Amino acid sequence: GIGINAGRIRGINSRIRGGEVQHTGVIPFLKKFEATVRCCTQNGVRGGSATVHFPIWHQEIEDILVLKNNKGTEDNRVRKLDYSIQISKLFYERFIKNEDITLFSPHDAPGLYDAFGMPEFDDLYLKYEKDKSIPKSTIGAQELFMDLLKERAETGRIYIMNIDHCNTHSSFKDKVNMSNLCQEITLPTKPIQHIDDKEGEIALCILSAVNLGLLTDIDELEELCDLSVRALDEIIDYQEYPVEAAKISTLARRSLGIGFIGLAHYLAKNQVNYESKAAAKLVDKVSEAFQFYLLKASNNLAKEKSKCLWFEKTKYSDGILPIDTYKNCLLYTSP
């Protein structure tokens, strides 16, 4: 399964070469993605999957939101893909204030897509809203959010990605533009112009998980995290890379995604109700230990093998750790 960033695709009927040609919009491209994904299966049993990312301000967002539902026709639906709608604080504020959201074709608003998720986005967005020379349309923020939530509830496969928070809390100095299939990994990416392009960047998920349900003591995490980090780091060097843009960035960043499973089992073993405040405190405690031991293992590995090639491109190189952007006020807001 893969993540696809389609947010740069022009909106339907956008002018090309000064109006000489009009763009066909996102749906024909999504049809192509869908066909490509479906031709890849594991022994004919498990098919390929993809999640496609779009900004909430995209010109075709209203049509994008309904692409998975069982209404419409095969011509205007792309049901075999999943979708991630990217939102930032500005749009939540407009929802709260019952204001409008202005929709753009990315090509008509230069730099807007590149700024999305970064501090400079808001000023640029407001500037383009006032520019009468740029094609645009508006929709009520509450109407659009309700449509998003309705389709999310009915299809179960439309995700919400808070793109500004992904960058604020990211470990990277490079911008995060998208996520992966399941939305748990956020790594920097750059478009490739051809299959041998060495300037682009394709992010790979190097993943494993620790089963918390089997723990008898939280201190056992130290050895488990160390083993996980070392095993995955070996895989990075061992595996083959058919695409240069994936090989270069993976070897240079050496990003690992190590999570935990069996959380409900772990809470039950500790006689904690899943929805209680005590559960939130326990999850915070085990997550903090988990993160600490993973960082410790990574540091020990760097002492043995030297730091990764692109270490200076991370916030770690400036002494900024995940806990430094963590908001304590959110910890005890669970019901």
Question: What are these model-predicted stretches?
Answer:
Residues 1-18, 26-29, 39-43, 151-250, ...:
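Function-dense linear segments that define catalytic or interfacial modules
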